[in-house]
């Protein structure tokens, strides 16, 4: 479960680089939205993984 959290976090970082760095000017808003979506999914997945281990 924590592997999924790491994957979603990496995807969020990639979306942040494209969205906040201005690399993809046409897709800035989409990349910003994807960053926050994948960041939330990564956090939820990490919490679920930690709760299941107990």
UniProtKB/Swiss-Prot annotation:
Family: Belongs to the UPF0391 family.
Cellular localisation: Cell membrane
Species of origin: Cupriavidus pinatubonensis (strain JMP 134 / LMG 1197) (Cupriavidus necator (strain JMP 134))
Main location: membrane
Pfam families according to UniProt: DUF1328
Cellular component, GO, one term: plasma membrane
Transmembrane among keywords: yes
Protein's UniProt name: UPF0391 membrane protein Reut_A0124
Ranges annotated as spanning the membrane: 5-25, 30-50
Keywords, alphabetical: Cell membrane, Membrane, Transmembrane, Transmembrane helix
Topology within the bilayer: Multi-pass membrane protein
